[in-house]
Amino acid sequence: MSAFTPASEVLLRHSDDLEQSRILFAGDLQDDLPARLDTAASRAHTQQFHHWQVLSCQMGDNARFSLVATANDVADCDTLIYYWPKNKPEAQFQLMNLLSLLPVGTDIFVVGENRSGVRSAEQMLADYAPLNKVDSARRCGLYFGRLEKQPVFDADKFWGEYSVDGLTVKTLPGVFSRDGLDVGSQLLLSTLTPHTKGKVLDVGCGAGVLSVAFARHSPKIRLTLCDVSAPAVEASRATLAANGVESEVFASNVFSEVKGCFDMIISNPPFHDGMQTSLDAAQTLIRGAVRHLNSGGELRIVANAFLPYPDVLDETFGFHEVIAQTGRFKVYRAIMTRQAKKG
């Protein structure tokens, strides 16, 4: 998170105009521009724990991580710079939340890559802060407007729900597989053996569907779930509650907040961070798993077949197995033995 993204580079073209502003940065904060831009004052709000980790090191309490921003998070700000995410419902949740808190007259900037659909910000904010495009560069658009009317924000109206084999799944904007169970997770679920026992960690838990499905046929497992995403953490908690499953759920950048060892780690790891392709999380997951597995414990992950995980698995564990595959996905299994490197 050191090099600036194209969106931030577009903003830097206007840095002179922002020096006297008291800015709230929010949305898909992929770099540390909020901590480095010369302003009268800067705050940041993010739903992504790994982004908060980086920003809080430089901004302290002026960087906040939560599902819903509060009045304290936007206090004294006269400008919003919002980085448009790839997910439109996620943008709507965040913008309606923030604009309901900011005072009328607040300057509103929205910036994002053209391929993310940033141009739809104009229609989304038309009734509250009419936007005009003020710059276009690096395949990004920058839009500006002024808040004329605060929207009414009700987080409860953004919840979604679907069923999988009799299980209730609760979801929020920005959560992976928000509209239904994805094919990769289905394949991973098909490999989980009934009547499994022991401690199981679900990394990148999303809406919690893997864990509740596993718990249904293996009720003696002791589950722990984590995700970098605040919406995912809240969705998993709701999914677990709806299905009567008890578990600890918390925000973590892969293993950053995880303590102790487990008998099994399961994951459908992401390979995108915002609009960018990133294998960092999955490689951190594989390499770090050996420090959180009991002897004889296993890592079981599903991934797109083209991703280069076999080499990392072999390098870390000494070997791996492919226990299920389709044309698009593979389920990998690696066992914690004396060969595994705990480096």
From Swiss-Prot:
UniProt cross-references to SUPFAM superfamilies, sorted A to Z: S-adenosyl-L-methionine-dependent methyltransferases (SSF53335)
GO CC annotation terms, alphabetical: cytoplasm
HAMAP family tied to this protein: 16SrRNA_methyltr_C (MF_01862)
Reported function: Specifically methylates the guanine in position 1207 of 16S rRNA in the 30S particle.
Pfam families associated with the record: MTS, MTS_N
GO terms of molecular function: 16S rRNA (guanine(1207)-N(2))-methyltransferase activity; nucleic acid binding
Alphabetical list of Gene3D superfamilies matching this protein: Vaccinia Virus protein VP39
Protein location: Cytoplasm
Superkingdom: Bacteria
Similarity field: Belongs to the methyltransferase superfamily. RsmC family.
Enzyme class at the top of the EC tree: transferase
Keywords assigned: Cytoplasm, Methyltransferase, rRNA processing, S-adenosyl-L-methionine, Transferase
Binding partners and assembly: Monomer.
Protein name stated in the entry: Ribosomal RNA small subunit methyltransferase C
Primary location: cytoplasm
Catalytic activity: guanosine(1207) in 16S rRNA + S-adenosyl-L-methionine = N(2)-methylguanosine(1207) in 16S rRNA + S-adenosyl-L-homocysteine + H(+)
Catalytic activity, EC: 2.1.1.172
Keyword Transferase: yes
